[in-house]
Amino acid sequence: MDKTYQPHAIETSWYQTWESENYFAPQGVGDSYTIMIPPPNVTGSLHMGHGFNNAIMDALIRFRRMQGRNTLWQPGTDHAGIATQMLVERRLEAQGISRHELGREKFLDKIWEWKAESGGNISRQIRRLGSSVDWSRERFTMDDGLSDAVKEAFVRLHEDGLIYRGKRLVNWDTKLHTAISDLEVENHDEKGHLWNLRYPLADGAKTAEGLDYLIVATTRPETMLGDAAVAVNPQDERYKALIGKFVELPLVGRRIPIIADDYCDPEFGTGCVKITPAHDFNDYEVGKRHNLPLLNIFDKNANVLAAAQVFNLDGTLNESVDGSLPAAYAGLDRFEARKQIVAAFDAAGLLVSVDDHALKVPKGDRSGTIIEPWLTDQWYVSTKPLAEPAIAAVEDGRIAFVPKQYENMYFSWMRDIQDWCISRQLWWGHRIPAWYDESGKVYVGRDEAEVRAKNNLGPEIALQQDNDVLDTWFSSGLWTFSTLGWPEKTKALETFHSTDVLVTGFDIIFFWVARMIMLTMHLVKNEDGTPQVPFKTVYVHGLVRDGQGQKMSKSKGNVLDPLDIVDGIDLETLVEKRTSGLMQPQLAKKIEKQTRQEFADGIASYGTDALRFTFCSLASTGRDIKFDMGRVEGYRNFCNKIWNAARYVLDKGEDCGQNGEAVELSLADRWIISQLQRTEAEVTRQLDQFRFDLAAQALYEFIWNQYCDWYLELSKPVLWDETAPVERQRGTRRTLVRVLEVALRLAHPFMPFITEEIWQRLAPLAGAQGKTIMLQPWPVANEARIDQAAEDDIEWLKGLMLAVRNIRGEMNIGPGKPLQLFLKNVSAEDQRRLSENDYLLKKLAKLESMTVLTEGAEAPLSATALVGDMEVLVPMAGLIDKGAELARLDKEIQRLQGEVQRVGGKLSNAAFVDKAPPEVIAKERAKLTEAEQALGKLAEQHARIASL
């Protein structure tokens, strides 16, 4: 083995070997265990969330594969409708070409060309992270098979009365000209205004105070052109007498009713609210309760129409309400209309006041434009009938959420579920399988030929397919079964569905998880007709945030690419990466400064195993993950530790009883074997419970502290002792080899590359059969090999050695200087342990002699420590220069007192505490605590030496 651990030298070649040998494919034996990769957008590259997700899924798959399960981890990518269309449009615009000039077919050809060029980027990154996915089964949501499944699902849901077309309010992106989902809307906190407007009462009505008008408060005065009512709270005494009366809508002259609704907060403004059902989601709900007309005043660009389109709640035209609008505003965009309408109110003496107001402004996450609630014809899934069985599946335990608290989030959304708008006004995506004749009648079918045959439509009847495509989440919702061949009854579908685990972030429980459950349970049935669930467990993790707990985003300049941590990146390239393509270029300087401060030397190459182990160690239940580069560095050191331990074992491990020769186990051998059983049980238990953090912690503790720090040291005296029986030396060599081999198998799901590399060299000595660690059996604890007596004896020995080590440290005695040791208050058990381990103790603690003092015997002037009730004494005569040591301690105490004074002064300075970021203050407080503790220890040490 190379002297130092070089991840790059081993990672790529091992992945190629595993893939070419087909080790990732299901082995065809054992109970099935399936995970479907949540498909990343084909447009993108993997971010830290994907890296985290992949580390967790691969740990599960490798763990279950080693347990003998027939594992399938299926990869794939999502066509990502809006994101992909925008990206390709921008590329074409840079060449001076618009998609409308190209036309639909040629534009789609361009997208497929682009997908062929760049679609492999994600696959390359997944490979680099060591993910053991079955590449032969890779899927894309626009593959032919998946497109057929999408059409089949749409047609079946339509036949079952669960898909319909209707005119409803949607999130409308005025730049992209499409409806978008709630997930694609970002609410931005902005400073805005609240306009208080005077609406005259009609028919001579008066308020309780004798006024002939109401004052309504609004953040969107331009929408008043579409007002259908003014609402007041039914309990508001000020307006009770006016309920059922009318106001005259200023500028428009339309009479609109005053209605009572609990939606109105009597404490907000004057307690009167204008209701515009066609341009506000809350108002739409009020409109439904009071059967108000819907007056659509905007076109698809959010420009004011010449006359409002007036509809009933069922989407039919309302011809009884006058939709006339003032000609002055026709064609104006909504913000220009706002200015002119406010000016007109002011000129008419109807503008009461304008107040500053904090707003939540909805913007499209792709276009950045302000989203307009807009009335339009769309396709919908009727979700309430689908939600009931999906709720029951979680209630009765067929699907479990881990952590369990996310079940409540799921239930609260599912019990208040709204119908799902599934159509998008895009070109890229699954085109809706619906056709219209010239009269506008709609026909749904798998293709045009089926539509014509089913409805007896001859060739003389022209049919036009719906131009819209389906919401990306619709095809993603079929992901677990469409990728296994549904609607055909394939062997893969029979074997691997339902899947076992979905690993996902909490932010898409509603948008993806819930919809997968609803669609799967309706469309996929067992032989007896009972519904199948898409997965048995949903493992929900938090967001991966930066070290300060901030969300990672391009605009914050704190995004990390997992592959930059794996392969390393120089500072200039990192700065360029973080500052290019910003939506807000003015942030570039700030981001550059921050990056140069945080990564002055760029990012070192840590390798995949260190990054994966970091992700697993941070995977505590449900909390957001604060990603810490210090942890990656620590786990890179862990890889080095394992590598160096393996070099020692391979060097010493020959003649370890691999041919059946007799062995004798030492106390240390029995102890480490016993500890191994406990670790096997603990790691397995925690992985079964999805506690990757605790499994990683148990593994780290065993390998670093018990095996490397203690057992390797305890093995040396046995191997050095020329008088030791050959069987005992062979027993220690065998234990060194076999315990490491088992530890490598335990670590493999977390750190696949380093474990494979070392295992290949160690396997012959350990008597392990097989070509790869991946397919080795998972270690199972053997309770018969737990040796409590050996554990107790070693803990006692460790206590004694640490006591001697501490005395050396406190008294500044060199580690190699032989010491005399005196022991007082020695029990019979202590005496036995001393006698049995005399050679071991003298070698490891560097002792010249050990003397047990009889009761009442005078001890020389010594530094002391306790091991249980036994007193450990190291005589100081001739070991230290008392004066020089006290002078050294005085100097160090003085330095620390200065540090305490400096940091304490900083923290008691109000100007510093008020202005400094919380993480800087926390750092200073930690410094102060550390300095105070060190000062206390030095003072104790000073007193001990002074008393000698």
Swiss-Prot record:
Pfam family, one: tRNA-synt_1
Sequence motif: 'HIGH' region, positions: 40-50
Gene Ontology biological-process annotations: valyl-tRNA aminoacylation
Enzyme class (EC, first level): ligase
GO CC annotation terms, alphabetical: cytosol
Sequence motif 'KMSKS' region, location on chain: 551-555
Sorted UniProt keywords: Aminoacyl-tRNA synthetase, ATP-binding, Coiled coil, Cytoplasm, Ligase, Nucleotide-binding, Protein biosynthesis
Keyword ATP-binding in annotation: yes
EC number(s) per entry: 6.1.1.9
Molecular-function annotations in GO: aminoacyl-tRNA deacylase activity; ATP binding; valine-tRNA ligase activity
Domain notes: ValRS has two distinct active sites: one for aminoacylation and one for editing. The misactivated threonine is translocated from the active site to the editing site. The C-terminal coiled-coil domain is crucial for aminoacylation activity.
Stated role: Catalyzes the attachment of valine to tRNA(Val). As ValRS can inadvertently accommodate and process structurally similar amino acids such as threonine, to avoid such errors, it has a 'posttransfer' editing activity that hydrolyzes mischarged Thr-tRNA(Val) in a tRNA-dependent manner.
Family: Belongs to the class-I aminoacyl-tRNA synthetase family. ValS type 1 subfamily.
Protein name: Valine--tRNA ligase
Organism: Pseudomonas savastanoi pv. phaseolicola (strain 1448A / Race 6)
